[in-house]
Every structure is written in C-alpha cells, then in structure tokens.
C-alpha cells in the first residue's frame, strides 16, 4: 500500500509503499483511510525527541485519521498503526462521522478538540457562567477552544496571543477580551490582575508555559493576609513559550490555585472513551451544522515530503488526503 514513510528519525516522511497492516486481535478494526491531519505531535514523534518517538523503522507516520471500516461506516479513529497511509488498524474506540461533515474537517478537528475540550470539560470541569482565560489562543487548538468555551456557556472568554489579526478574528468566535502578548511580561501581569479583579477568572487553559504563564501566575498571587480568594483552575496543555517556570510556594499559599495538566499521559482510559463516544460526536455535529470552525489546507499523499514542514497561514491545520 501507499503511505507516508519515516526511514530515519529526524528526517521528513517520504511517499512510498509498505505492506498493508492486518488485524491481530479482537477489538481491532481495519480502516481504509481517506484523510489524516499532520499535527505537532506527529512532527515531534518523527523528530526522535518525543517520549513516544518511533522505534521500528521504516514505519507509517500519523496518529489519527478518517476513513471507512469494512462495513462501510465512515469513522474517525486513533491508529494502532500509522494513519497516513491507504490502510491502517484502529481500536474499537472510534467515532462515527455525520454524513454532512467532510473528511478534511473531520480529520482536522479531533486533535484541536482533544487539546481544548478535555482541559476545559474533563480537567477544569467548566460550568456555564464561569470566566475563562486562554493563554496562547491564536493557534488551531486555541481557536477551537474559544468556540467550545462559548458553546458550554462561558461568560467572559479572555484570550492572549501575538498575532493581532487572529485575536480580532477570535472576537467573532466568542472571545470577549483580547490581550496582545509582547516581551513586556510585567504589562501582561498587570493586565491580568485588572481583569481578575473586575471579573474573577475561574479557568485558565495555557498553551504557552514559560514567561507568559509565569506572569499569569504572578497576577493571581495574593498580596496580604486579608486577601479573599476565589478558586482558579489552571490547566497546562502546551509549552510553546518555554519548558520551565519558576513556581514559588507563596503563589500557591496566597490564593486558591489548582494547577494541573492535560495530555495523553494525564487522561484515563475512561476519559478517552468519553472523548471519543460523547464529546467528539457532539463537536462533529456542531461542525456539521456550521457552528464549529477550523481552517485547513489539504494536500494529496504524494506530496507529503514537500508539505510536511510547509509554513501555513496562522491557525491552519495541514491535512493529507488519500
């Protein structure tokens, strides 16, 4: 079969042929793939620097995708084998796709939903009427997250980012306040303090970590013994601005901050089933009705090597079609 093959860690996958995978045990399903998104996770695994980097080479790359089961059902699934190929093997934890949702959109959405709905709904337990801050919201996942927060009834949706044009677009998607990130982290801290005093922030979804997140933490710090706190649930879902922060004991002792992470390692098997069987079907229906949007750029499998590292428009997901 044809596929996107990785021959060496740190190299770009190439178009080639490899043996078609077969079902090995009960609970596995063969899928004829029609579309698969290229995500940061996929690139990290091919780099050799990710904890889940590929080991047996050559191999088909791609973590998830869309296609048809042997009975003709069109589904989204996460691959037991690589998904950017004509055929793959997935588990029973797949999600049927509505008829009026196209393959490219269905392939592009799940990772962004995983990175936004799971932090919001599963980790932070967002409730209608709460105020949410997305730190680093101008990427694909942040843009989807803003729409999901609005869908679930968030009152104030504050977003940060460097791309002013995307920040303006986020207002149309549900953002109520936008903050432009610069190198002046002290200014960000003061802005967050002012917002938090006026409309207490209940949930923070952070995609950046590093210095911008450090400023947000500092903004929540209580400054006197009579400080009256409100609970702030902070979920880290990325580290695009840095791998480390400086967390002092005083920050955690002076206010009620609940700091947690969201990612494959922090989500239980049961939570991932909820994602595939409850959350994702709901989001697919929203997208099919035109109420959840994602920007995509699609290219055929044959040009995988040329487009793998292509610079896309901000907030756009690359999708490979087969």
Each predicted region: which residue ranges?
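Short, glycine/polar-rich helix-capping loops at beta-to-alpha or helix-loop-helix junctions
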Residues: 83-84, 161-169, 244-249
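C-terminal hydrophobic helical "lid"/dimerization subdomain
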Residues: 225, 270-322
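Glycine-rich cofactor phosphate-binding loops and adjacent beta1-alpha1 units
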Residues: 173, 177-257
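NAD(P)H dinucleotide-binding glycine-rich loop of Rossmann-like/cofactor-binding domains
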Residues: 61-64, 74-136
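Mid-domain Rossmann-like dinucleotide-binding core that forms the NAD(H)/NADP(H) cofactor-binding site
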Residues: 110-184
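Active-site capping/gating segments
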Residues: 257-275
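Conserved beta-strand elements of the Class I
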Residues: 29-30, 133, 235
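Glycine-rich beta-strand-centered segment in the early N-terminal region that forms part
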Residues: 21-39, 47-82
């Amino acid at each position: 079969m044809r596929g996107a093959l990785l021959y060496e860690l740190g190299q770009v996958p190439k178009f080639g042929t490899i043996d078609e995978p077969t079902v090995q045990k009960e609970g596995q399903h063969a899928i004829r793939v029609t579309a698969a998104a290229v995500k940061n996770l996929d690139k990290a695994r091919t780099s050799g620097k990710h904890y889940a980097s590929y080991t047996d080479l050559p191999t088909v790359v791609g973590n998830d995708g869309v296609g048809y089961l042997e009975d003709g059902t069109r589904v989204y699934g996460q691959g037991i084998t690589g998904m950017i190929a004509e055929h793959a093997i997935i588990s029973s934890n797949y999600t049927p796709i509505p008829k009026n949702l196209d393959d490219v959109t269905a392939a592009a959405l799940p990772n962004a939903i995983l990175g936004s709905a799971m932090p919001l709904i599963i980790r932070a337990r967002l409730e209608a009427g709460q105020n949410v801050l997305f730190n680093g919201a101008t990427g694909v996942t942040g843009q989807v997250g803003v729409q999901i927060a609005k869908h679930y009834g968030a009152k104030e949706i504050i977003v940060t980012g460097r791309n002013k044009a995307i920040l303006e677009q986020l207002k149309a998607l549900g953002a109520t306040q936008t903050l432009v990130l610069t190198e002046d982290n002290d200014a960000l801290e003061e802005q967050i303090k002012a917002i938090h005093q006026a409309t207490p922030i209940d949930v923070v979804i952070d995609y950046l970590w590093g210095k911008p997140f450090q400023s947000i933490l500092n903004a929540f710090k209580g400054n006197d013994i009579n400080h009256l706190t409100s609970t702030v649930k902070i979920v880290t879902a990325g580290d695009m601005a840095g791998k480390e922060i400086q967390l002092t004991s005083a920050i955690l002792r002076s206010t009620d901050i609940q700091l947690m992470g969201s990612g494959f390692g922090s989500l239980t098997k049961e939570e991932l089933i909820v994602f595939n069987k409850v959350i994702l079907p709901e989001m697919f229906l929203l997208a099919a009705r035109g109420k959840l949007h994602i920007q995509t750029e699609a290219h055929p499998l044959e040009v995988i090597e040329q487009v793998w590292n292509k610079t896309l428009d901000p907030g756009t997901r690359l999708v490979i079609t087969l």
